[in-house]
Amino acid sequence: MKTFIDFFCGGGGFSLGFYQQGFKPIRGIDSWEPAIKTHNLNFGLNDTKKNVLDFENIEEIEKLEDSDIIIGSPPCVSFSLSNKAGNADKSLGIRLIETFLKVVAVKKHKKNSILKAWYMENVPNSKNFIKEFYTFKDLNLENFAIENNLNINDIALYCKGNVLNSNDYGSPQKRERFICGEYIERLDNNIKKGFKCLH
């Protein structure tokens, strides 16, 4: 069974979609204790609350289990157009997104990586603050790149995505989200089918 880790997991709405498609959640990460307790109850896990910003330290990333997929729903309040008409401070939101991407980059490029795909969603306005690609240098992974015989200016992740409407996929509600991610060359066809909507 393919495994996944859910960052900013909340009670597990994003996890549920993957679970219903046959993937196994092995960890949920969230800084809000009620969310983690709910996620644990929903998926039979025993996680404790953790701040995603802890993973700015690469040693914390290296402690994480390896998984086939990583998903994440960074907080959208910074990017929501309903927050100060879209003029709210974006610095924390960008920092959380880039920390998530840093985790993904390390898991993607580490030796003997098993990561096959990653997937991130946020409100449509976040698209304006997410680059189409990030180098190792962009993600403060210069030392990691050098240690793994990679050029610090090489592209670590491609983040080009699209704004999708849940109503187009069977939901009775109009809900637009910016979706980005990658499926990696070692991905098998069954997982690849689920990511066709990104291209």
Label the predicted regions.
Residues 37-48:
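Short, conserved SAM-binding/catalytic segment
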Residues 1-4:
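Extreme N-terminal starter segment of soluble prokaryotic enzymes
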Residues 58-67, 76-199:
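Class I S-adenosyl-L-methionine
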Residues 17-24, 42:
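A short, Lys/Arg-enriched amphipathic alpha-helix followed by its capping loop at the start of a domain
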Residues 28-29:
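The conserved SAM/SAH-binding core of class I Rossmann-like methyltransferase domains
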Residues 32-33:
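Conserved SAM/SAH-binding beta-strand->alpha-helix loop
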Residues 7-11:
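Class I SAM-dependent methyltransferase "Motif I" SAM/SAH-binding loop
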